[in-house]
C-alpha cells in the first residue's frame, strides 16, 4: 500500500534543505568513483549517509516521524540521500530498494502537474511539493520524465521496522 503525507516541512525549512544540499550533490560519475563501483548513477545525487550531516538532521527526523506515524510502526533509517533530476530520459532508471521494507520520497522542489510525484509500474502517483510518498521497498519506480529542464529535488529514505 502507498501513502501520501502532505505538508512535511515549513516553507522556510524546505527552501533551506534545497540550499543546503547543493554542495553535496555529485554527478553519476563522481558518485560511482566515491563508491568504487563501475555503475553510472542517474542525475545528481548525494551519498546515502547524509543523516550524519548536521544540516539534514531536523528535516530527516521530521520525515521519519511522519513515516512512523503514518505506518504506525517503529522504524529504523537505513539510508537517505537527495536526488536532483531535470526530466531527461537519462535521469530515469527503474529500480526498487530490496531488501529494505519501506521506501519514501519527499518532494523538496517540483513543477506542479509535470513532475510532482513518482512513476510506478502501475502508474504515476501524484504528490505535491513538500509531501511524502511512503511505499513498499520492493515496488519498481523511477522519477518522471519532462519536456522541461526544471530541477526537481527529492529526498529518498529506506526504512525497516525495528525488531
Where do the model's predicted regions map?
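Non-heme Fe(II)/2-oxoglutarate
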Residues: 1-73, 91
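Catalytic core of non-heme Fe(II) oxygenases with the double-stranded beta-helix
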Residues: 73-145, 150-163
Amino acid at each position: 500500500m502507498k501513502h501520501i503525507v502532505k505538508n512535511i516541512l515549513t516553507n522556510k525549512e524546505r527552501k533551506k534543505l534545497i540550499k543546503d544540499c547543493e554542495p553535496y550533490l555529485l554527478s553519476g560519475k563522481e558518485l560511482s568513483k566515491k563508491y568504487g563501483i563501475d555503475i553510472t548513477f542517474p542525475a545528481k545525487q548525494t551519498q546515502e549517509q547524509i543523516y550524519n550531516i548536521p544540516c539534514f538532521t531536523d528535516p530527516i527526523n521530521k520525515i521519519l516521524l511522519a513515516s512512523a506515524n503514518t505506518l504506525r510502526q517503529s522504524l529504523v533509517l537505513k539510508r537517505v540521500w537527495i536526488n536532483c533530476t531535470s526530466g531527461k530520459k537519462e535521469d530515469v532508471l527503474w529500480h526498487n530498494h530490496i531488501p529494505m521494507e519501506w521506501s519514501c520520497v519527499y518532494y523538496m522542489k517540483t513543477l506542479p502537474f509535470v513532475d510532482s510525484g513518482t512513476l510506478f509500474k502501475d502508474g504515476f502517483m501524484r504528490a505535491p511539493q513538500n509531501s511524502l510518498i511512503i511505499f513498499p521497498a520492493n515496488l519498481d519506480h523511477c522519477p518522471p520524465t519532462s519536456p522541461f529542464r526544471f530541477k526537481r529535488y527529492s529526498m529518498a529514505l529506506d526504512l525497516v521496522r525495528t525488531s
